[in-house]
UniProtKB/Swiss-Prot annotation:
G1: region residues: 495-502
Region of interest (Disordered), ranges: 95-394
A cellular-component GO term for this protein: cytosol
Taxonomic lineage of the native organism: Bacteria, Pseudomonadati, Pseudomonadota, Betaproteobacteria, Burkholderiales
Binding site residues for GTP: 495-502, 541-545, 595-598
Functional summary from the UniProt entry: One of the essential components for the initiation of protein synthesis. Protects formylmethionyl-tRNA from spontaneous hydrolysis and promotes its binding to the 30S ribosomal subunits. Also involved in the hydrolysis of GTP during the formation of the 70S ribosomal complex.
Bias kind Gly residues: ranges: 371-384
Organism: Paraburkholderia phytofirmans (strain DSM 17436 / LMG 22146 / PsJN) (Burkholderia phytofirmans)
Name under which the protein is recorded: Translation initiation factor IF-2
Lineage: superkingdom: Bacteria
Region G4, annotated ranges: 595-598
Record region (G5): 631-633
SUPFAM superfamilies: Initiation factor IF2/eIF5b, domain 3, P-loop containing nucleoside triphosphate hydrolases, Putative DNA-binding domain, Translation proteins
PROSITE patterns: G_TR_2, IF2
């Protein structure tokens, strides 16, 4: 609580009130009694008075002195060339004074004086450093100049030696040429001398035969001597030429070696000069440069000159792995021992070295910038201290060439496998991963990119491994030691829709399959194996509707024999021709079954003629295709058909390995709500067991359950046996090859590769709106789109329905399949339909309760179909409603102009007679002059007498004016017409 009067303030200060009153009076504060009040101003005046009376000032409290120390290092070489590191400590003292209005000027003056003292010391130190640095730079410049002069002298000497060698070579060549010319001249003289002797010989022989016989030995002897002399001269010439060439080659090699040595010296001098220039351009504080390799021991004088400069500290012996001394250990060792270091002094331990040396050095000054401390002395070592614990920096070790391996990195690899490929410990790989910020274990999987980065970090060469090719795996599977055994034939039943394929198969299987198909037509591939008295046959029943072309092609691809079913009362139809084409393309033999022979209007002969026209010739006509007349209703001819099928199978000699990994074909695939992805597989070779890891396209997984065509569980399936498997990661595409893989990792690797490879194809099938499509739409004008989402029960039906709907697209209306998949209609499908304004088509599927509720809330249209005809027809009708209506002109009447009136503010008005039909007020009109159309427009007014009328019929007169047209002449004709819109259909 603040004191308000003199008595309270005296009690607070613990002094008598009378003494306080006296002090207040002395300070100029007039207070009469102890009860008088005191203000803050009175207290401040009292405080100032007491300070002045006691002689105390606040000058010391207003001044702060700061002392700053800065330690730096410089390197200096003495006269012997030893490099020394000198520590420089700069102490700066600065005083800050708190100024007020009265003493501002005095404070400034004192501050300047204090700073001036410090600045003088700093200035002197900087001048000394600058002078020292200038001396060093001048010394280095002189050294550089001397070295350049020496190089120039060496270059001049080399050129002189080359000129002398060249002159010697030319002189030798000239001498050899002179000798060669002299020898040739002597040979010519001998030849000329021999010619007269030969010419005179016949005459002498005729006159004196005895003398000629006596002279023959002398001539022969002379010619032999001449030949020997010429051979000796040629040998001497060759020897002289060879000596001249050897001398020239030796001179050239010597000159080249000298030139290379001079070039090396020049390059070293230029590098040193460039380094000096760079350091001269660097800031003054950046004095510690990355150490450079020490000079060769063969040049001690130059090494001494190169050491001990401000900008070039010498490098320790063990730091430069690429220095020349590393190649010659015997020469490097003396250099290391004979060059004393800058700080070498006798240690207390003498020559014992070891830990005492290290402790002594630690107690010394640790210079941060001195990376060398001498030529061959590191931080820990010294020439005297080579004991039991000598430092590695002072011990020469022969460099070992690191082994760089080429590591093939697959898509995924564990840490242990990667370390094994590089021949390093797994801990090294884990350390590298930790440096990159990832904590991994020894069994953790790494992706290819991360693994390649690790390989490069550890100094090896990483190569992306060639991805596993499923075709290569198939080839490897074929090269198997398993014995090939006979297998059942795979028979595909093909033909036109409603020709009785399924009924025929139904009779063979003794099961009512056709009754279960919607509309009585097959919309899936059915795979069954039937045990007959003659053997096992696997049947594939394919759809005959035109929409299922791809499904039929898959059936022909997997089959051995095709049964072509043709109705005897219908003949060859479009899908019959297509089935024949599929069978021929696959090189599959045909067995023709002429069905429905029990009908009254059956005509098998006509069917045979039509098939012959298609290239299918019966055996009775000299062909190779057996024709069997059957009736699926009565069972007539069924046994003959099976017998022909098995006969064809025996001819083909169908075999497959049984004790081998299975491979096959996906016949059909679907998404079951309780089972997940389900695929119908036809095993083509090997044996498929429950628990095997299978790969089907981009789907993979372990076979969790396996059912036969009757729905009964089975543990294994051999060749030509169809089974339904569960456990795949996703619904595979129908027609994909199925391969049994050795393990999950390999299967996942190939599946991920295929997913990445075919991602673009998948996106293209979804037909997302992209820039190209937008540009197409802009070029084509207004194009209407019908977005659809197609969900089907199986993959083949969904594929066939999508293809059929896409065929409905025209230039004006296009079908856009936003999404197509297998399975029930879910909430995500409804949300997608809401965003894309699409219609959902469910083919043999239904929406769950949540999806139906969401569709009702968002107004999404869901259509259900179980026959492909109905889906295609309704979409076609909806697309017809989206077409722009067609405009048609209907001529309603003809008018003849009898008279033309000019009306102010209106223009020309034609007095007309309706000669045919009628004229309406809202009609359009064409003006004909001499039967040529000169104008087309609309009526502006239609009057009869003075009244506006809506219609004037034939035989009546009227007045007409045309909008924006006044060039009306008597005798013109008006053709009156109306434009109507007519709905279009696809």
């Amino acid at each position: 609580m603040a004191s308000n009067n003199v008595a309270q303030f005296a009690a607070e200060l613990k002094m008598p009130a009378g003494v306080l009153l006296e002090q207040l009076q002395a300070a100029g504060v007039t207070k009469a009694s102890e009860d008088d009040s005191l203000s803050e101003t009175d207290k401040a005046r009292l405080l100032d008075h007491l300070r002045k009376s006691h002689g105390s000032t606040d000058a010391d409290k207003r001044k702060i002195t700061l002392t700053k120390r800065h330690t730096s290092e410089i390197k200096q070489s003495d006269a012997t060339g030893k490099a020394r590191t000198i520590q420089v400590e700069v102490r700066k003292k600065r005083t800050f004074v708190r100024r007020d209005e009265t003493s501002a000027e005095n404070g400034d003056a004192s501050n300047h004086v204090a700073e001036a003292d410090v600045d003088d010391l700093e200035l002197q130190r900087r001048e000394e450093e600058a002078r020292h640095e200038a001396e060093l730079l001048e010394k280095q410049a002189q050294e550089l100049k001397a070295r350049q002069e020496q190089l120039e002298r060496e270059e001049a000497e080399r050129q002189a030696r080359e000129a002398a060698a060249e002159a010697e070579r030319r002189r030798a060549e000239e001498e050899a040429a002179k000798k060669r010319a002299a020898a040739e001249a002597a040979a010519r003289e001998q030849a000329q001398a021999a010619k007269p002797a030969q010419a005179a010989q016949p005459a002498a022989a005729k006159a004196e035969p005895v003398a000629a016989k006596a002279a023959e030995p002398a001539v022969a002897k002379q010619s032999e001597q001449d030949d020997e002399r010429a051979a000796a001269e040629r040998a001497a010439q060759r020897e002289a030429a060879k000596k001249a060439e050897d001398a020239a080659r030796q001179a050239a090699e010597k000159a080249r070696a000298e030139q290379e040595q001079i070039a090396k010296r020049r390059a070293a001098a230029e590098a040193e000069a460039r380094a000096i220039r760079e350091m001269m351009n660097t800031p003054r504080k950046a004095q510690v440069k990355a150490p450079e390799p020490a000079p060769k021991p063969a040049e001690p004088a130059k090494a001494a000159e190169a050491k001990g400069t401000l900008h070039k500290p010498a490098r320790p012996a063990g730091e430069a792995p690429s220095r020349p001394a590393a190649k010659k250990p015997a020469a490097a060792a003396p250099a290391a021992t004979t060059t004393p270091s800058a700080g070498d002094k006798k240690k207390p331990g003498g020559g014992k070295g070891g830990w005492q040396d290290d402790a002594a050095k630690r107690r010394g000054i640790k210079t941060r910038g001195d990376t060398s401390g001498g030529v061959d002395r590191g931080w820990r070592g010294g020439p005297k201290g080579r004991g039991k614990h000598q430092d590695q920096n002072t011990t020469f070790q022969a460099p070992t060439e690191p082994i760089v391996r080429e590591v093939h990195v697959p898509e995924t690899i564990t840490v242990a496998d990667l370390a094994h490929k590089m021949a390093v410990k797994a801990s090294e790989v884990i350390k590298s991963m930790m440096k990159l910020g990832q904590m991994v274990t020894i069994n953790q999987m790494l992706d290819q990119e991360t693994a390649m980065i690790i390989v490069e970090e550890l100094g090896h060469h990483a190569v992306a491994a060639k991805l596993d090719d499923p075709e290569a795996m198939l080839v490897e599977g074929e090269i198997s030691d398993a014995e090939s055994l006979p297998r059942p034939p795979v028979v595909t039943v093909m033909g036109h829709v409603d020709h009785g394929k399924t009924s025929l198969l139904d009779y063979i299987r003794r099961a009512k399959v056709a009754a279960g198909e919607a509309g009585g037509i097959t919309q899936h591939i059915g795979a069954y194996h039937v045990e007959t008295p003659r053997g096992v046959i696997t049947f594939l029943d394919t759809p005959g509707h035109e929409a299922f072309t791809a499904m039929r092609a898959r059936g022909a691809k997997a089959t051995d024999i095709v049964i072509l079913v043709v109705a005897a009362d219908d003949g060859v139809m479009p899908q019959t021709k297509e089935a024949i084409a599929h069978a021929k393309a696959g090189g599959v033999p045909l067995v023709v079954a002429i069905n429905k022979i029990d009908k009254p209007d059956a005509n098998p002969d006509r069917v045979k003629q039509e098939l012959v026209a298609e290239g299918v010739v019966p055996e009775e006509y000299g062909g190779d295709s057996p024709f069997v007349s059957v009736s699926a209703k009565t069972g007539a001819g069924i046994d003959d058909l099976l017998e022909n099928v098995l006969l064809q199978a025996e001819v083909l000699e169908l075999k497959a390995p049984v004790e081998a990994p299975a491979k096959g074909l996906v016949i059909e695939a679907k998404l079951d709500k309780g089972k997940g992805p389900v695929a119908t597989i036809l095993v083509q070779s090997g044996t498929l067991n429950r628990g095997d890891v299978v790969l089907a396209g981009s789907a993979y997984g372990r076979v969790r359950a396996m059912l036969d065509e009757t729905g009964k569980p089975t543990k294994s399936a051999g060749p030509s046996i169809p089974v339904e498997i569960q456990g795949l990661s996703e619904v595979p595409q129908a027609g994909e090859e199925v391969i049994v893989m050795p393990d999950d990792r390999k299967a996942r690797e190939v599946a991920l590769f295929r997913q990445g490879k075919f991602r673009d194809v998948k996106l293209a099938k979804q037909q997302a709106a992209k820039l190209e499509n937008m540009l197409e739409q802009m070029g084509e004008g207004e194009v209407a789109y019908m977005p659809l989402i197609v969900k089907a029960d199986v993959q083949g039906s969904q594929e066939a329905l999508v293809q059929s709907l896409l065929k409905l697209s025209t230039d004006e209306v296009r079908v856009q399949i936003v999404h197509g998949a297998v399975g029930g209609i879910s909430e995500s499908d409804v949300n997608l339909a809401t965003a894309s304004k699409a219609v959902i088509i469910g083919f043999n599927t239904r929406a769950d309760a949540q999806a139906r509720k969401l569709a009702e809330a968002n107004g999404v249209d869901i259509r259900y179909y179980n026959i492909i005809y109905d889906a295609v027809d309704e979409v076609k009708a909806a697309m017809s409603g989206m077409l722009a209506p067609e405009k048609r002109e209907i001529v309603t009447g003809t008018v003849e102009v009898r008279q033309v009136f000019k009306v102010p503010k209106i223009g020309a008005v034609a007095g007309c007679m309706v000669t045919d039909g009628f004229v309406k007020r809202s009609s359009s009109v064409r003006v004909l002059r001499n039967n040529v159309v000169i104008f087309t427009g609309e009526l502006d007014s239609l009057k009869r007498f003075k009244d506006d009328v809506k219609e004037v019929r034939q035989g009546f007169e009227c007045g007409m004016s045309i909008k924006n047209f006044n060039d009306i002449v008597e005798g013109d004709q008006f053709e009156v017409f109306e434009i109507t819109e007519v709905a279009r259909t696809l």
